[in-house]
Amino acid sequence: MKDFLAYIIKNLVDRPEEVHIKEVQGTHTIIYELTVAKPDIGKIIGKEGRTIKAIRTLLVSVASRNNVKVSLEIMEDK
């Protein structure tokens, strides 16, 4: 699922080499922490958050087939 997420994100941004995804696994939960270049954050979020909502919907659909809950968080680069 991490590769699927990376594929989607890297095709949306201008700097795919700066996309980093950290996977934190719990018992029945997976949290993906997404870090992208500052100029690309707006592209990931999209107008009124529509793009990130669509990405999260896709992840939830894939995860539900495996009986896992999934969460996607956008981390700010400091």
Swiss-Prot record:
Domain of life, per lineage: Bacteria
Gene3D superfamilies: 3.30.300.20
Domain KH: 29-78
Gene Ontology annotations for the cellular component aspect, listed alphabetically: cytoplasm
Keywords of this entry: Cytoplasm, RNA-binding
Subcellular location field: Cytoplasm
GO terms, molecular function: RNA binding
Key word Zinc present: no
Principal subcellular localisation of the protein: cytoplasm
Role, per record: A probable RNA-binding protein.
NCBIfam families xrefs: PRK01064.1
Family: Belongs to the KhpA RNA-binding protein family.
Annotated protein name in UniProt: RNA-binding protein KhpA
Organism: Chlamydia caviae (strain ATCC VR-813 / DSM 19441 / 03DC25 / GPIC) (Chlamydophila caviae)
Organism taxonomic ancestry: Bacteria, Pseudomonadati, Chlamydiota, Chlamydiia, Chlamydiales
Annotated gene: khpA
